[in-house]
Amino acid sequence: MPHDGALTIRPYAPGDDAAVLQCQNRAFACHQDLDHWRWKFVRNPAGRTLLMLAEHARDGIVGVYGAMAAPALCDGQRVVAGQCVDHCVRSEWLQAGEHGLFVTLGRAFLERWLGEGEGQALFVYGLPTAGWRSGARHLGWQVVRDWDILFRELPGGAPPRPVSAELDVGTVPSFDADVDALFDRLAAEFGVTLVRDRAWFDWRYASRPDRRYTLLECRERRSGRLRGVAVHAVADVVRANTGFLLDWLAPADDLDTTTALLGAVERATQAAGSELLCGVFHPMDVRFQHLQELGYRVRGTPWFLTLRTARFDSLYFRERWYFTLGDSDLV
C-alpha cells in the first residue's frame, strides 16, 4: 500500500470497527456507539463498507474517509451510491503529505471505491462543511445544487387538512413487500434515485438503533392497495423541535395520496409539539410545485449537494436526481 512517512493508507478490513470509531469520536469530541457505527457503515443494504483509513504503527487509526453505501438507480441501471460522511483526521496528523492527510485519504478513497467495477460506487455525494473547497480543488468534487427546503408553519389549533375518504393513512413499524412493488411502478419516473425498496427503508429508518421514525403508509380503504409511503421525525435541526418530512414515495400525479400523506405528516408534527414542518424535494420535481400549491414556502439553507461520479457529469444529476432529506444523514 502507499505510505506517507510512518502512515499506511489502506481500505477498511473486518475487525477495524472499534479503532475507526475511536478515531472518529476523538476527532469529533463525541460519543457515537459501535452499534450505530456498524448500522451506518457495515449493515447497509448495499453490503459494502466504503472506508479508507490512515494507520500509524504506534497511534493506530488516525484518519478516516468514508461513505454510507446504498443501492441506487441511475439511467435504469442498478448501481451503488455512497453518501460521504464522518471524514476525520486527528489534529496532529492534519499536515501529513503534500496537501494534507484529508487529500491523501480522499484520493485513495476515490481511486479504490469510485468507478464501475465490481464493488465500486458509481457516484458518491455529500453535504460538505466549510472546508469543501479543498475537496473541489484537489479531489474534483462538483456542486450539484443548493439544498433549499420546503416549510410550513403549523400553529397550535390549526385545523387538519381535508383528505379523501377513500384513503386510509396509518403508521407501521416497517413497510412490507408492497413497497417493493410501489418502487418498481415508480422507478421510470426517476432518472437517478436511491432504491427505495423494503430493504432500504428497513435499514435507513426501521432498524436505526439510536433514533425513532414514524413510518406512514397510505392505502385504499376498500382494496387495501398501497398508494404511497412517507417517513416523519422531529429533530433539533433548522430550529429546535422541527418536524421533518424525511422520505416520500408516491406517484407525482396522485394528488389524493399526496394530500392524505401530507395531512398525516402534519398531524404527526403537531402531535409532537412542533409548529414547523420541513422537507426537501428536487426543485425540478413536480412534487416541489405541488407542496407549494398546498401551502408550503421555500427557504435556502447552509447546505448544498456535491458529487463525484464515474459516469455522466454534475449537470446530468442536477436535472434528474430524485432526492429527499432521507438521502442525507442530517436527521
PLM feature spans:
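Secondary-structure boundary elements
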Residues: R112-Q120, E220-G224
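A conserved beta-strand-loop-helix scaffold within acyl/acetyltransferase catalytic domains
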Residues: L7-H87, T129-A130, P173-P251
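Active-site/acyl-donor-binding loops of N-acyltransferases
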Residues: D4, A121-E166, R222, V231-L255, ...
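Hydrophobic, Leu/Ile/Phe/Ala-enriched alpha-helical segments that form helix-helix packing faces
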Residues: Q24-F28, F109-G117, A136, L186, ...
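Core nucleotidyl-transferase/polymerase catalytic module
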Residues: P2, N44-A54, V62-G66, G82-V89, ...
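Conserved acetyl-CoA-binding loop-helix of GNAT-fold acetyltransferases
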Residues: V89, L94-W113, L255-R267
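Conserved N-terminal entry element of GNAT/NAT acetyltransferase domains
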Residues: M1-G15, G156-F175
